[in-house]
Amino acid sequence: MVDIALRSAVVAFMVVSLSAMFTSTQHSEVHIIGFSIPVSLRWNRSQPFEFLVVVELLICAYAFVQFVYQSVVLAKNAVPTRRCIWVQLAADQVCAYLVLAAAAAAAGASRTNKSGFQSLGMQNIKVPGVCIVLDKFCNRATIAIIFTLLAAGASGISVTLDVYMLTLTYYMG
């Protein structure tokens, strides 16, 4: 029962994160030394954000399949085999690490967007950070990262539950 709740939480967190990423598009202009330069940012123009979206889609699909599987096991009142629990443990660990890696990559890119363009290396020319100019994009990316980290936490708890279930199968016979 707890596993089903964790799987549904992962799916919900991923859906919120994906919707934040898919709607994070913004266009603006930067004024430098009298010139107006148009800038725009979208999730698919940054490799870390692309990685985040691809991982979120994969993990969301995996969590949904596991949700359906756990629901069927619960409905049939069946007990999963040790082999099945081992496979689930391995897959859950891979998913938890993947989600954490994607969140870390996106957080690094987001941090660069906030401060990466503070200076061009000249004393008198200052360029504002991307997030000052494109604040809507950065706010939605931050929301996506937060919900991805929540999904990573739920995946980590699911791994712990898998270990507990595996321990029970060894002690129960």
Curated annotation (Swiss-Prot):
GO terms for cellular component: plasma membrane. It is found in: Cell membrane. Residues 1, 70-84, 162-173 are cytoplasmic. Coiled coil: none annotated. Keywords: Cell membrane, Glycoprotein, Membrane, Transmembrane, Transmembrane helix. The chain crosses the membrane at residues 2-22, 49-69, 85-105, 141-161. The keyword Transmembrane helix applies. It is a multi-pass membrane protein. Glycans are attached at N44, N113. Belongs to the Casparian strip membrane proteins (CASP) family. Homodimer and heterodimers. This is CASP-like protein 3A1. It comes from Pteridium aquilinum subsp. aquilinum (Bracken fern).
